[in-house]
């Protein structure tokens, strides 16, 4: 159980990578831009991949009626997400420590994994809602209006995950380093659960096969 607890602690600490690396990355490439434009989405705000990327993206979006990229203080998520991550790290360290001294068993590690998974799904759902609003809630007085074949205004929602063609732009949306560290951390906590479970099974087997004392 001690080995499982150490892995649980290491897995929880991996989440701290979200404060150093971006969670998600969106890139826009087009023939007129030899160097693609991009934005890195951190849990504390949005930054351009290069110095003037956000400024250039906002300039392009202005013509088709899209909103400017929000500042950190304009979205509640950038205040709440860091608190949630810190809370989950502390909880993971606490569970790992209690497991190390034998106060709790491996099932608590699975509980942490399930809770983190639910929070992750909620975060992705919220991210998708923002992408939908960002790409669909357009200024009716935009300089350029593109109409679909059915007569409805074209929307410019970036993909939640993967690739999409928007006008003459190739748009990609992919997990960044912070997300991969989070996935690795969550996987480690799941590994900790299985190691703890196997350890308990082994201990139970040894107890059952222990010869009776005359």
Where do the language-model regions lie?
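N-terminal signal-anchor transmembrane alpha helix
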Residues: 3-28
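Juxtamembrane interface at the cytosolic side of transmembrane helices
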Residues: 2-6, 91-122, 189-214
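Juxtamembrane membrane-interface segments at transmembrane alpha-helix termini
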Residues: 119-131
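Hydrophobic alpha-helical transmembrane segments
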Residues: 10-14, 18, 77-97, 113-121, ...
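Membrane-interfacial loop-to-transmembrane-helix junctions in polytopic alpha-helical membrane proteins
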Residues: 3-6, 73-80, 101-108, 167-177
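Long, glycine/tryptophan/cysteine-rich extracytoplasmic
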Residues: 20-78, 128-173
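A hydrophobic membrane-anchoring alpha-helix module
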Residues: 172-199
């Amino acid at each position: 159980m001690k080995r499982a607890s150490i892995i649980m602690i290491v897995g929880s600490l991996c989440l701290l990578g979200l404060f150093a690396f971006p969670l998600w990355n969106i890139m826009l490439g087009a023939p007129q831009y030899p160097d693609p434009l991009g934005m890195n989405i951190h849990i504390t705000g949005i930054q351009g991949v290069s110095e003037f990327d956000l400024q250039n993206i906002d300039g392009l979006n202005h013509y088709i009626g899209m909103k400017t990229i929000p500042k950190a203080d304009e979205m509640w998520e950038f205040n709440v997400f860091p608190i949630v991550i810190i809370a989950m790290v502390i909880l993971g360290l606490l569970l790992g420590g209690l497991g190390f001294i034998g106060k709790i068993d491996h099932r608590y590690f699975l509980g942490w994994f399930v809770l983190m998974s639910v929070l992750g799904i909620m975060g992705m759902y919220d991210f998708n809602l923002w992408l939908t609003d960002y790409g669909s809630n357009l200024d009716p007085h935009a300089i350029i209006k593109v109409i679909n074949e059915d007569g409805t205004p074209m929307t410019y929602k970036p993909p939640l995950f993967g690739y999409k063609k928007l006008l003459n732009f190739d748009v990609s949306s992919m997990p960044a380093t912070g997300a991969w560290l989070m996935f690795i951390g969550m996987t480690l906590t799941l590994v900790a659960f299985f190691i703890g479970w196997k350890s308990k099974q082994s201990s139970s087997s040894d107890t059952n096969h222990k010869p009776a004392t005359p």
